[in-house]
Amino acid sequence: MDETEPVTAAHVKYLAARTRGDDAFLRELKAAARKSSIPEIWIAPEQASFMQILLKLRGARRVVEVGTLAGYSAINLARALPPDGRLTTIELDETRAEFAAAWIARSDVADRIEVRRGDAARILPSLADASADAVFLDANKTGYALYLQQARRLLRPSGLIMVDNAFAFGALFAKGPQEGEVEAVRSFNEVMARAPGFHSVIVPIGDGLWVGAREP
């Protein structure tokens, strides 16, 4: 058969039930984030596990994240790094950055994570060329194309690019005009599919995850 069974909600539930989930600390972090009115748009636990495996296979030591939110993904990714690994996470929203920094400080990987507060469009250019083994984008979708350009510069050969929300919050195939973020994702997906210097694929996990390798 040329066609495979489409991924359904049942598949997603099945996958999640057979993937390492959150520990007590991460569950507590999420509960506190909800009480602080931080939107529940962090990555899924099964997506976190998948990304951790990718980082371990890559032997990543330096990671850059754009979009800290509550710090959930930063902590997960940092846990996949060696003891001397380093993750720099960038967050524009001051309230979210403050919340994330407080919880990261309490985590078991506090010494591996640096929270940079401000606009990624200004912070990314200050980072050194070929200084990262992986870059994760999970911020404003209208900025993805610009962040991808910076990721190309930052990544070492064979470095990983990972980009969240390729399925546009479940609205990728919705008919008619959509809100700005959905249209931005649709546009970025076309850019990413043809981006020079990257070999990439969308993985149907979470809200869709772009995974690519920086080509020499």
What kind of feature is each model-predicted range?
Residues M1-A134, K141-M162, A166-P216:
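A short alpha-helical cap/connector motif
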